[in-house]
Amino acid sequence: MKHPLPYGFAKAQQMLLEDDGRERVLWATDNTAPSALGEVLRLHAVSRVEREDSAVLTERIARVYASGESSAATVVGEVESEVDLSRLLQDLPAVEDLLEAANDAPIIRMLNALLTQAAKDGASDIHIEPYERSSAVRFRVDGTLREVVQPNRALHAALISRLKIMAELDIAEKRLPQDGRISLRIGGRAIDVRVSTLPSAHGERAVLRLLDKSESKFTLEALGMSGEVLRSFNRLVHQPHGIVLVTGPTGSGKTTTLYASLGRIDTTSTNVLTVEDPIEYELAGIGQTQVNARIDLTFGKALRAILRQDPDVIMIGEIRDFETAQIAIQASLTGHLVLATLHTNDAPSAITRLIDMGVEPYLLSSSLLGAQAQRLVRKLCPACKRVDGDGRWHPVGCAACGQSGYKGRTGVYELMVVDDALRALIHGRAAESELLAAAKTGGFVPMRDDGARLVAEGVTSFEEVLRVTRD
């Protein structure tokens, strides 16, 4: 399907011209200017004109033009033969729609193509990496890195410079790491890009984290929890006070779980405040504070200030040190519900980690409501997954999933709810093994067993569960 009208014109005039090779159909709305409509009819052999609702057509225009963009590899190939470094330093607005910048300077087109394809593929990160004789661009999709294109090594410095201009970084400083941010739109979708540059042996490398603001409406039901875990976790986040911990490595979906938890809270009658590093998504009705190392605004200092703001619920992006842990525990003991993340491998080790930080066991036993550990597993592509004779599902690979066999991700969880038996063990500084044994007696289901549920349902593969969990 071809769309002959330029994206900017189609968007502004609310017209979509579709050419399937047999006929040309022009879609318009009641807001379409008659003069623009007449001009398109004069220049193109239109078979028929159809009317559509304004909001529906606007969304459809953004969707079809975004999906119809040339691949990054194609654009990079074109750019390598026509790069014009003299236009590299053009001004670029802080927010723009990349689909409207298709005819810009070659390096700009290359970077726009990479960003557009990354958004289309659902990538969470873009890696731009220099080596001695080559360079590479890789996307992280569903938690796994894959190479997308190898641009000419001679273009690498120009690409990084263009990126620095967009992120408002110092293009002359190549010796120090730099961090910046880009706000842009791709086919009507608002996307925040966090940019990190790092000097390496063969030039600067860059990693771009993509945050799609249109996907910021989270619900606990959509995270893949089993029915029992969902019910238990929901009860925890509706307690009037105490602390709930969500644990796991970087990229395991901890912040998403906390955001979804906050979505369950009635913010009209509750004061909800967060301290984060960084603020990943803006949440309606919630006061969000970002730590800032440059001005010495740490988690601890931000939390002390938050406690003077009459909060009911406090979310802490990460407990990193004793000061933050101590304030979180004290807040939970003085009538606040505290939701926080922690870097541990499983739920029981969250308890020993806090004690190792210096938290007194008697305080922790009085305040901790529960700890949930989690990982993200890739979901089998529904278009190509196959089942063997034993009833076990396996990845295959097709065009829909980029030949990986997987498309999308979901969570595997283990939730340890603190009961009287566990409280006594925590108070007595019990070992992790004792905590785990007591939790299992109370119905605790380890993460790998939760993964087995997803395997049995055909959601993911056995190999994928083994990859992200441990014995």
Model-identified regions with their sequence ranges:
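Conserved beta-strand segments of alpha/beta enzyme cores
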Residues: 47-48, 271
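Conserved beta-strand -> loop -> alpha-helix junction used to position metal-binding or nucleic-acid-contacting
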Residues: 49-60, 369-370
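Flexible hinge/switch segments at interdomain interfaces of large molecular machines
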Residues: 79-94, 207-211, 278-282
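Short, flexible helix-loop junctions that flank or precede catalytic/ligand sites
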Residues: 100-471
